[in-house]
């Protein structure tokens, strides 16, 4: 698994709704050097509502990880579920300062969502 596996070439997509599904496991955490949890098993989905000038993105995740119990010091399975939405618009330069709005340069044709999915899972 590589971060480019989470790149969406949106320039060729028609106006309308598009779904992108990703099966996640521990190799996904390895992309980010994240070692706090193991045993990641889950599915992430990004639904894109594309118009001529704006994309509405809805991310969802459902899965589980293995976590260490603070009391028993044993591994247990923790179920996870999370979702968030973000809007993508075009502007002069890249800007992700607003957590609900992403601005891409007019020249961009690819949406890189690996970091978005990582945050979706880790913040579950």
Predicted regions and their residues:
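Acidic and generally charged, gly/proline-rich low-complexity regions
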Residues: 1-124
